């Protein structure tokens, strides 16, 4: 399911959160875009923002980068990452399923 949703992620050993974009999602992982160069195998805490009706909500997951690809678009360099979920709470999983069902 193609989507363009804002996300915030934090590398488990880093003090500051960074931003990115969710491009695609499934029940087992995410395809994201970020300008940061992060090594494969890095574990992230990810929060994805999305609308339900007239309000914004989010879900949070812990995920691992399982692949990455360099991208150059509109003169800006960045990376696409394939993330595999490591941990997701039941409530967040329900929100993810709502998002995926449209």
Regions found by a protein language model. Name each.
Residues 22, 63-65:
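Conserved hydrophobic positions within beta-strands
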Residues 50-52, 67-69, 87:
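Beta-strand elements of well-folded, non-transmembrane domains
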